[in-house]
Amino acid sequence: LVGPNSIGLVSTATGLDATFLEGRPPEGSLSLMSQSGAFIAAVIGWAAQHDIGFNDVVSLGNEAVLDEVDFLRQWDDDPATDVILAYVEDIDDGQAFIETAQDVTATTPVVVIKSGRTEAGAAAAKSHTGSMAGHDDAYRAAFEQAGVLRADTIQDVFDVGQLLAGQPGLDGDRVAVLTNGGGPGVLTTDAVGDSRLDIATFSDETRADLDELLPAAADITNPLDIIGDADLARFDAALDAVLADEAVDGAVVLSVPTALYEVDALADRIGDRQTEHGTPVVACLMGGEPADRAADTLAEYGIPNHFDPARAVASLEALADYGDIRDREYETPTEFAVDRERAFEILAQADDREVDYLGVEAMELLAAYGIP
């Protein structure tokens, strides 16, 4: 039983549409659950416009029976779900969520956008669902412990979700930047520098190959600027050499539109080279309507296209974060005997006194949680 206070659910694979939404989302490998029906209604049309497909979409409502933990388990066992996305305002059973998410994220990425991060947002969440949103630092720590990737914006949720669904894992932090325009290449390099990622150092063999392939005016270091007169053949040859380098774990490919190549054809070359080498790639094919068409071509290869290089780097960084999550081993947490009744009594007394701090009662509260 889903709900109450839910707009229903959709399963695109089976054709089930038990909602009153205006349109049905396209079929895909993302599964989305949300504690806000309005969030689903807001993003479904936008996602369809951007060719973002879903396997299941579930409005959780007030979670009288089924909650986010149940759907984590459901989608972990579902081969049609590659990535789980979630909008949450609060989580009632934090321990169950953490333990379940640790199991799930070993094979299936989970990306969560958590509202109520600020005092004003928490108050709005309470008025919306009646939920008591906990302190955001506690949620941040819980998500980290659970192996959950946290997104701060709607755009981030789908940027990361699409990349995780379409690209192989990032085995390291070394990134190549390939561009035909100096300015965007520098912006991308700055974004890499602001992230956990590193600018890769090309091997001597790759540098020798690039020296033969590129004009004398081109600098064969990383970021690799193949200069503004690059045609399709130069783009393709340079990308082939870069992705073949074992010192490169991932790549950002940028193109500034010129009359020397068709951007649709470039998108096909990028997709073919990524498939050939198996190295994760994100693209920034800039421009207007032709770039939109190229983005559709890239999507067929599971490669996202971003106008802003910072978004491309951020999604690639999330791919590296998930690689760490997938490979890590969890320690069994220490369990304490908790006297919850006494703990609530201490906090209630402090609330009655209208104070936001504890004096000597803090020791009693720690003792109630078994903390010496």
Task: Identify the function of each model-found stretch.
Residues 2-372:
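Catalytic-core regions of core metabolic enzymes
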